[in-house]
Amino acid sequence: MVRRQSAPRLEFEAAAIYEYPEHLRPFLSEAPALPGVYIFHSESDTLPLYIGKSVNIRSRVLSHLRTPDEATMLRQARRISWICTAGEMGALLLEARLIKEQQPLFNKRLRRNRQLCSLQLSEQKIEVVSARSVDFSHEPNLFGLFANRRAALQSLQNLADEQKLCYGLLGLEPVSRGRACFRFALKRCAGACCGQETPQAHFLRLQASLERLRVVCWPWKGAIALKESRPQMTQFHIINNWLWLGAVPSLDEAATLVRTPAGFDQDGYKILCKPLMSGQYEIIELHTDCRQS
Protein backbone atom coordinates (compact mmCIF):
# COMPACT_ATOMS: atom_id res chain seq x y z
CA MET A 1 0.00 0.00 0.00
CA VAL A 2 1.42 3.34 -1.01
CA ARG A 3 1.00 6.05 1.58
CA ARG A 4 -0.42 9.18 0.07
CA GLN A 5 1.77 12.17 0.74
CA SER A 6 0.08 15.12 2.33
CA ALA A 7 0.18 18.42 0.52
CA PRO A 8 3.02 20.66 1.67
CA ARG A 9 2.00 23.10 4.35
CA LEU A 10 1.60 26.55 2.92
CA GLU A 11 3.39 29.28 4.82
CA PHE A 12 2.58 32.93 4.61
CA GLU A 13 5.35 34.94 3.00
CA ALA A 14 5.00 38.68 2.89
CA ALA A 15 7.31 38.88 -0.10
CA ALA A 16 5.00 36.67 -2.16
CA ILE A 17 2.17 39.21 -2.05
CA TYR A 18 4.30 42.35 -2.09
CA GLU A 19 2.87 45.33 -3.88
CA TYR A 20 4.57 48.70 -4.11
CA PRO A 21 2.94 50.92 -1.45
CA GLU A 22 1.52 53.59 -3.76
CA HIS A 23 -0.34 55.18 -0.85
CA LEU A 24 3.03 56.24 0.62
CA ARG A 25 4.45 57.76 -2.58
CA PRO A 26 3.35 61.35 -1.74
CA PHE A 27 5.43 61.25 1.44
CA LEU A 28 8.48 60.08 -0.49
CA SER A 29 8.35 63.09 -2.80
CA GLU A 30 8.53 65.39 0.23
CA ALA A 31 11.20 63.47 2.16
CA PRO A 32 14.47 65.46 2.39
CA ALA A 33 17.84 64.14 1.27
CA LEU A 34 19.24 65.13 4.67
CA PRO A 35 20.34 63.36 7.86
CA GLY A 36 17.75 62.64 10.50
CA VAL A 37 15.11 60.26 11.83
CA TYR A 38 12.04 58.99 9.98
CA ILE A 39 8.88 57.40 11.38
CA PHE A 40 6.36 55.07 9.74
CA HIS A 41 2.94 55.66 11.33
CA SER A 42 -0.13 53.43 11.39
CA GLU A 43 -3.67 54.74 11.83
CA SER A 44 -2.81 55.23 15.49
CA ASP A 45 -0.78 58.31 16.34
CA THR A 46 0.28 56.86 19.68
CA LEU A 47 2.11 53.71 18.48
CA PRO A 48 4.55 54.10 15.55
CA LEU A 49 5.25 51.12 13.33
CA TYR A 50 8.94 51.76 12.76
CA ILE A 51 11.57 54.39 13.60
CA GLY A 52 14.83 54.59 11.68
CA LYS A 53 17.72 56.94 11.00
CA SER A 54 19.89 57.81 8.03
CA VAL A 55 22.29 60.39 6.68
CA ASN A 56 19.87 60.63 3.74
CA ILE A 57 16.24 60.27 4.84
CA ARG A 58 14.79 60.18 1.32
CA SER A 59 17.12 57.45 0.10
CA ARG A 60 16.57 55.29 3.17
CA VAL A 61 12.78 55.62 3.07
CA LEU A 62 12.82 54.71 -0.62
CA SER A 63 14.77 51.53 0.17
CA HIS A 64 12.04 50.54 2.65
CA LEU A 65 9.33 50.99 0.03
CA ARG A 66 11.20 48.72 -2.38
CA THR A 67 11.82 45.91 0.13
CA PRO A 68 9.36 42.98 -0.19
CA ASP A 69 10.40 41.60 3.22
CA GLU A 70 8.86 44.68 4.82
CA ALA A 71 5.48 44.26 3.12
CA THR A 72 3.66 43.63 6.41
CA MET A 73 4.84 46.90 7.90
CA LEU A 74 4.25 48.83 4.69
CA ARG A 75 0.66 47.63 4.37
CA GLN A 76 -0.10 48.96 7.85
CA ALA A 77 1.67 52.29 7.29
CA ARG A 78 -0.54 55.30 6.61
CA ARG A 79 1.97 58.14 6.67
CA ILE A 80 5.66 58.91 7.11
CA SER A 81 7.12 61.77 9.13
CA TRP A 82 10.71 62.83 9.77
CA ILE A 83 12.90 65.02 11.96
CA CYS A 84 16.04 66.46 10.38
CA THR A 85 19.30 66.67 12.30
CA ALA A 86 22.63 68.39 11.69
CA GLY A 87 24.38 65.10 11.06
CA GLU A 88 24.74 61.39 11.74
CA MET A 89 25.43 61.77 15.45
CA GLY A 90 22.19 63.63 16.04
CA ALA A 91 20.29 61.01 14.05
CA LEU A 92 21.79 58.16 16.10
CA LEU A 93 20.99 59.81 19.42
CA LEU A 94 17.47 60.86 18.49
CA GLU A 95 16.62 57.44 17.05
CA ALA A 96 17.73 55.66 20.24
CA ARG A 97 15.68 58.00 22.42
CA LEU A 98 12.51 57.77 20.31
CA ILE A 99 12.66 53.97 20.08
CA LYS A 100 13.05 53.70 23.84
CA GLU A 101 10.24 56.16 24.53
CA GLN A 102 7.72 55.07 21.87
CA GLN A 103 8.44 51.32 21.51
CA PRO A 104 7.59 50.99 17.77
CA LEU A 105 5.96 47.73 16.71
CA PHE A 106 8.64 46.68 14.20
CA ASN A 107 11.77 47.86 16.04
CA LYS A 108 13.91 45.89 18.43
CA ARG A 109 12.79 47.02 21.86
CA LEU A 110 15.16 49.23 23.87
CA ARG A 111 14.49 49.41 27.57
CA ARG A 112 16.43 50.68 30.56
CA ASN A 113 18.33 47.70 31.94
CA ARG A 114 17.81 47.66 35.70
CA GLN A 115 20.18 44.69 36.17
CA LEU A 116 23.16 46.18 34.30
CA CYS A 117 26.42 44.76 35.66
CA SER A 118 30.15 45.09 35.09
CA LEU A 119 33.37 43.41 36.25
CA GLN A 120 35.48 45.49 38.66
CA LEU A 121 39.17 44.80 39.18
CA SER A 122 40.75 45.94 42.44
CA GLU A 123 43.39 44.79 44.94
CA GLN A 124 44.26 41.57 43.14
CA LYS A 125 40.62 40.48 42.90
CA ILE A 126 37.72 40.74 40.50
CA GLU A 127 34.03 40.95 41.32
CA VAL A 128 30.69 41.63 39.68
CA VAL A 129 29.18 45.04 40.50
CA SER A 130 25.75 46.45 39.67
CA ALA A 131 24.86 49.86 38.23
CA ARG A 132 22.34 50.15 41.05
CA SER A 133 25.14 50.36 43.61
CA VAL A 134 28.06 51.77 41.60
CA ASP A 135 28.22 54.87 39.38
CA PHE A 136 29.41 53.40 36.09
CA SER A 137 30.08 56.89 34.70
CA HIS A 138 32.84 57.62 37.21
CA GLU A 139 33.90 54.37 38.91
CA PRO A 140 37.40 53.31 37.73
CA ASN A 141 38.50 49.83 36.67
CA LEU A 142 35.19 48.59 35.31
CA PHE A 143 35.28 46.13 32.42
CA GLY A 144 32.37 45.20 30.16
CA LEU A 145 28.65 46.00 30.29
CA PHE A 146 26.43 42.98 30.87
CA ALA A 147 22.67 42.47 31.01
CA ASN A 148 22.88 40.76 34.41
CA ARG A 149 25.20 39.07 36.92
CA ARG A 150 24.98 35.72 35.18
CA ALA A 151 26.13 37.19 31.87
CA ALA A 152 29.07 38.91 33.61
CA LEU A 153 30.21 35.66 35.25
CA GLN A 154 29.86 33.78 31.96
CA SER A 155 32.06 36.36 30.24
CA LEU A 156 34.67 36.01 33.00
CA GLN A 157 34.59 32.23 32.64
CA ASN A 158 35.07 32.50 28.87
CA LEU A 159 38.04 34.79 29.46
CA ALA A 160 39.53 32.30 31.93
CA ASP A 161 39.18 29.51 29.36
CA GLU A 162 40.89 31.60 26.67
CA GLN A 163 43.80 32.70 28.87
CA LYS A 164 44.17 29.61 31.14
CA LEU A 165 43.34 31.68 34.20
CA CYS A 166 42.45 29.93 37.45
CA TYR A 167 38.73 29.62 38.26
CA GLY A 168 39.62 29.49 41.96
CA LEU A 169 41.55 32.76 42.02
CA LEU A 170 38.77 34.41 40.01
CA GLY A 171 36.13 33.31 42.51
CA LEU A 172 34.35 31.11 39.99
CA GLU A 173 34.81 27.95 42.09
CA PRO A 174 36.16 26.98 45.55
CA VAL A 175 39.90 26.32 45.78
CA SER A 176 42.08 24.79 48.52
CA ARG A 177 45.21 26.75 49.41
CA GLY A 178 48.31 25.20 47.85
CA ARG A 179 46.41 22.49 45.99
CA ALA A 180 46.06 22.39 42.23
CA CYS A 181 42.59 22.85 40.82
CA PHE A 182 40.96 20.28 38.55
CA ARG A 183 41.53 22.41 35.45
CA PHE A 184 45.30 22.44 36.11
CA ALA A 185 45.36 18.64 35.68
CA LEU A 186 43.61 19.14 32.34
CA LYS A 187 46.18 21.79 31.36
CA ARG A 188 43.46 24.44 31.25
CA CYS A 189 44.92 26.47 34.14
CA ALA A 190 48.47 27.87 34.22
CA GLY A 191 48.85 26.90 37.88
CA ALA A 192 48.41 30.05 39.93
CA CYS A 193 46.47 27.87 42.39
CA CYS A 194 49.47 25.61 43.14
CA GLY A 195 52.54 27.80 42.77
CA GLN A 196 53.28 27.13 39.11
CA GLU A 197 52.44 30.78 38.43
CA THR A 198 52.70 33.66 40.89
CA PRO A 199 49.50 35.46 41.93
CA GLN A 200 51.02 38.69 40.59
CA ALA A 201 51.67 37.19 37.16
CA HIS A 202 48.15 35.76 37.12
CA PHE A 203 46.70 39.17 38.04
CA LEU A 204 48.71 40.94 35.33
CA ARG A 205 47.49 38.47 32.71
CA LEU A 206 43.91 38.98 33.87
CA GLN A 207 44.34 42.75 33.74
CA ALA A 208 45.78 42.66 30.22
CA SER A 209 43.03 40.40 28.90
CA LEU A 210 40.31 42.65 30.35
CA GLU A 211 41.67 45.87 28.86
CA ARG A 212 39.65 45.62 25.64
CA LEU A 213 36.47 45.67 27.76
CA ARG A 214 37.38 48.72 29.85
CA VAL A 215 34.48 51.09 30.57
CA VAL A 216 35.71 54.66 30.05
CA CYS A 217 34.98 57.04 32.91
CA TRP A 218 33.28 60.31 31.97
CA PRO A 219 36.39 62.48 31.40
CA TRP A 220 34.89 65.94 31.89
CA LYS A 221 33.96 67.78 35.10
CA GLY A 222 30.37 68.23 34.02
CA ALA A 223 28.20 68.64 30.94
CA ILE A 224 29.63 69.27 27.49
CA ALA A 225 28.30 70.45 24.14
CA LEU A 226 29.19 68.51 21.00
CA LYS A 227 28.95 70.70 17.91
CA GLU A 228 27.55 69.19 14.72
CA SER A 229 26.92 71.22 11.57
CA ARG A 230 25.82 71.07 7.95
CA PRO A 231 24.69 73.84 5.58
CA GLN A 232 21.65 75.63 7.03
CA MET A 233 21.77 73.77 10.36
CA THR A 234 23.95 73.61 13.48
CA GLN A 235 23.18 71.61 16.60
CA PHE A 236 24.87 71.53 19.98
CA HIS A 237 24.31 68.15 21.59
CA ILE A 238 24.27 68.52 25.37
CA ILE A 239 25.78 65.47 27.07
CA ASN A 240 26.56 64.63 30.69
CA ASN A 241 27.84 61.34 32.11
CA TRP A 242 27.35 59.68 28.69
CA LEU A 243 23.67 60.67 28.61
CA TRP A 244 22.38 62.76 25.69
CA LEU A 245 20.18 65.44 27.22
CA GLY A 246 19.02 66.86 23.90
CA ALA A 247 20.11 69.32 21.22
CA VAL A 248 19.88 73.11 20.94
CA PRO A 249 20.66 75.47 18.05
CA SER A 250 22.89 77.73 20.18
CA LEU A 251 24.93 77.51 23.37
CA ASP A 252 22.80 80.25 24.92
CA GLU A 253 20.02 77.67 25.18
CA ALA A 254 22.15 74.93 26.75
CA ALA A 255 21.03 75.84 30.27
CA THR A 256 17.53 74.59 29.45
CA LEU A 257 18.90 71.04 29.13
CA VAL A 258 21.83 70.75 31.53
CA ARG A 259 21.24 68.46 34.49
CA THR A 260 22.98 65.62 36.29
CA PRO A 261 21.57 62.31 35.01
CA ALA A 262 20.30 59.70 37.43
CA GLY A 263 21.99 56.40 36.66
CA PHE A 264 24.08 55.19 33.73
CA ASP A 265 22.77 55.24 30.16
CA GLN A 266 24.15 52.16 28.40
CA ASP A 267 22.80 53.10 24.96
CA GLY A 268 24.25 56.60 25.21
CA TYR A 269 27.62 55.21 26.24
CA LYS A 270 27.75 52.82 23.29
CA ILE A 271 26.86 55.57 20.81
CA LEU A 272 29.00 58.36 22.28
CA CYS A 273 32.15 56.87 23.79
CA LYS A 274 34.21 56.17 20.68
CA PRO A 275 33.30 59.38 18.78
CA LEU A 276 33.88 61.60 21.82
CA MET A 277 37.23 60.03 22.68
CA SER A 278 38.44 60.03 19.05
CA GLY A 279 38.51 63.83 18.82
CA GLN A 280 36.51 63.93 15.59
CA TYR A 281 33.96 66.42 16.99
CA GLU A 282 34.33 69.88 18.48
CA ILE A 283 33.71 69.57 22.23
CA ILE A 284 32.84 72.56 24.43
CA GLU A 285 32.91 72.19 28.21
CA LEU A 286 29.96 73.97 29.75
CA HIS A 287 30.32 76.20 32.79
CA THR A 288 27.81 76.07 35.61
CA ASP A 289 25.73 78.84 34.05
CA CYS A 290 26.25 77.31 30.55
CA ARG A 291 27.22 80.67 29.02
CA GLN A 292 30.32 80.64 26.86
CA SER A 293 32.47 83.68 26.19
UniProtKB/Swiss-Prot annotation:
<feature type="domain" description="GIY-YIG">
    <location>
        <begin position="33"/>
        <end position="108"/>
    </location>
</feature>
<keyword id="KW-0228">DNA excision</keyword>
<dbReference type="GO" id="GO:0009380">
    <property type="term" value="C:excinuclease repair complex"/>
</dbReference>
<dbReference type="GO" id="GO:0006289">
    <property type="term" value="P:nucleotide-excision repair"/>
</dbReference>
<dbReference type="GO" id="GO:0004518">
    <property type="term" value="F:nuclease activity"/>
</dbReference>
<comment type="function">
    <text>Incises the DNA at the 3' side of a lesion during nucleotide excision repair. Incises the DNA farther away from the lesion than UvrC. Not able to incise the 5' site of a lesion. When a lesion remains because UvrC is not able to induce the 3' incision, Cho incises the DNA. Then UvrC makes the 5' incision. The combined action of Cho and UvrC broadens the substrate range of nucleotide excision repair.</text>
</comment>
<protein>
    <recommendedName>
        <fullName>Excinuclease cho</fullName>
        <ecNumber>3.1.25.-</ecNumber>
    </recommendedName>
</protein>
<keyword id="KW-0267">Excision nuclease</keyword>
<keyword id="KW-0742">SOS response</keyword>
<dbReference type="InterPro" id="IPR047296">
    <property type="entry name" value="GIY-YIG_UvrC_Cho"/>
</dbReference>
<keyword id="KW-0227">DNA damage</keyword>
<dbReference type="InterPro" id="IPR050066">
    <property type="entry name" value="UvrABC_protein_C"/>
</dbReference>
<dbReference type="InterPro" id="IPR000305">
    <property type="entry name" value="GIY-YIG_endonuc"/>
</dbReference>
<keyword id="KW-0234">DNA repair</keyword>
<keyword id="KW-0378">Hydrolase</keyword>
<dbReference type="GO" id="GO:0006974">
    <property type="term" value="P:DNA damage response"/>
</dbReference>
<dbReference type="GO" id="GO:0009432">
    <property type="term" value="P:SOS response"/>
</dbReference>
<dbReference type="InterPro" id="IPR035901">
    <property type="entry name" value="GIY-YIG_endonuc_sf"/>
</dbReference>
